[in-house]
Amino acid sequence: MANSINYAAVFNRILDEKFYVLPRTMWMEDSTPGIIWEGGREVKIPKLGMDGLGNMSGYKAPQGDLTLEWETKTLQWYRGRNFSIGRYDVDETNFALTVGNALNVFLREKVVPEIDCLRIAAAAQGAVAYGQVIAQASADITTANILGLLLADIAKVQDKIGEQEQLYIQISTGLKNLLEQSTQITRYLNVKDFQVRSATLRLEAINDQYLIGTPSGYMHSVFGLNDGVTGGQTVGGVTFANLGPNINWIIAARPAVDAIARPQISKVITPDENQEGEFWKIMFSVYHGNWVMENKGDGLLVNLDTASADDLTVSTEAGASAGASTVTVTGVLPEGYMYVWKATSGSAPNVTIGGTLAATDSWAELPADGKITTTNGYGISVAIFAKSNRKAIAYVKGTVSAGT
């Protein structure tokens, strides 16, 4: 009898070897010890709480509480793709080699970039919700000031969590290039080892904090996902949605951002077994998600470009009566965010990225249909903010210019 090869096991070994070292966001993976994941879309994360010191009474210390709670998180993304290879396009002797090479390319060019994009955007959104936000026009960052700006942001994080925590700096490649041209940078740069499972990587560091150059195309605060099926989305992957500002850099202590990804080749069907036709069928899927821990938010800072949200649009049309111009807002919301709006008789209200938009200051939630009525000539601002703390991540301003 011929030997039976478990191709799924062969390809999953390739995944284990490659998947966790390729991402630029590998430092986020499994950063919290004790996470429980038993398959499915939910994970349980331990949260430890304890009281501080109190005064001794004689030889007796005051009683304190030590609590261990489990917070349930949902893996936001369940993605996959099936591939087919004709029986006669490859013979069985080199099938594993051919698919193994294709899998490497697929991981490097399709899977890992998507995961990096989504993790970076989620970290930026988490910083708006729980961490620190610095608004800085990218156009104003130069070789003369970038080192000072970056060191100042590192200090802001260390001022909250101390200098003993290792920091990770996710920076766009363009800005990293500017940083390397700084006249004083050689005083601060070094190289450090970083352990990813069984692999040891050599990463650059600034002031002993990891510095990870990342393609600028990944450094956006909002992305859309193609479903791989609908017309115009069959190519799959992510699409850039300019609903939020671009990211200059993210600075994080590892406990502040956590990510889990579980890729797998779930099944390989041979041509002899395949009921659909004479071809090999390979089924790939990945559960993944990441989140910012609210109680660790002090260890996270995002430096955002101050550009407004170009893909957030506001249109106006005449209403049925005076003071009833119809305003329609369109855009796609990130998970955990909502629209608010405010109109005044003067200029459009100011919005600060990372600033709080209070309901007591007349900021109102946008209706589900995206339509509101207000007065022609009024200035109007529409913002996207985090439900958790009402901090703005994006906005658009304009004037109601139609109606009676």
Sequence positions of predicted segments:
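N-terminal "assembly arms/tails" that initiate or stabilize quaternary assembly
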Residues: 1-76, 298-303
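Extended, solvent-exposed, turn-rich assembly/linker loops in the middle of proteins
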Residues: 129-200
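Extended, compositionally biased alpha-helical segments that mediate assembly or anchoring
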Residues: 233-236, 240, 254-308
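Acidic, Ser/Thr
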Residues: 327-336
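Surface-exposed, short loops/turns at beta-strand junctions within beta-sandwich domains
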Residues: 363-378
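Extracellular recognition modules
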Residues: 379-385
